[in-house]
Amino acid sequence: MGLPELTFSLEKAAGTVSARMSAGAVALILRDAKDNGVYTIHRESDIPAQLGAANVTAIKRAMIGYINRPSVVYVAVIATAAEISAGFAALAAYSYDYLAGPVDMPASDATTLSGLVKAQRKKRYIGKAVLPATAGDDEGTINFVAAGIKSGATTITAAQYVPRIAGLLAGTPANCSATYAALDELTAITPEADPDTAVDAGKLILVDDGRKIKLGRAVTSKTKLAATDPEMLKKIKLVAA
């Protein structure tokens, strides 16, 4: 499949007003010593006042969106020593489209979240997890792989940036694609040596076209299809539809 050719469509401009107004919900699991609990965030003033700076930044990144802002951001704040599964369980009563984890999330947490989402999707759960470097081979796991991310003088890890990606995907209307969505705040990345191979391996990557840094082809981590599986399981837009 690889990256798409740089062709442009008028679909965005031709979309209906109702479709443009549509936006999904984001859920974040964050670890913090204070303000533990679940919060519903519609605006920056809803962010708990005592959260650490990195967690506040994560929420603000999730709120940026793309064509639209996310309809809402649900934030489960768990204790610093709590299991990631506790945050997932705390969000069980909430309906959301994209989930992201703590900004310092280790690989073990990402693997756990991928497994939890995969199990829940068998019960008609619609959420998808945006996780750093997690090859889940599942339509419910979005494997965000990026390095050398910079916004001016600030270096950002993939784990710190997944809330931004989750918010961008949630802010993409159903009649549009997140492929080549511009990330205007970014100034540098380490480019993939072979972008097409990365995309075919189920990696959601960043690309630099020399003018802007953008999202690559909007794919899920699904790479192996059974005989009865449709090709659309590899594409975020069609899985989300």
Language-model region placement:
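Small-residue-rich
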Residues: 1-145
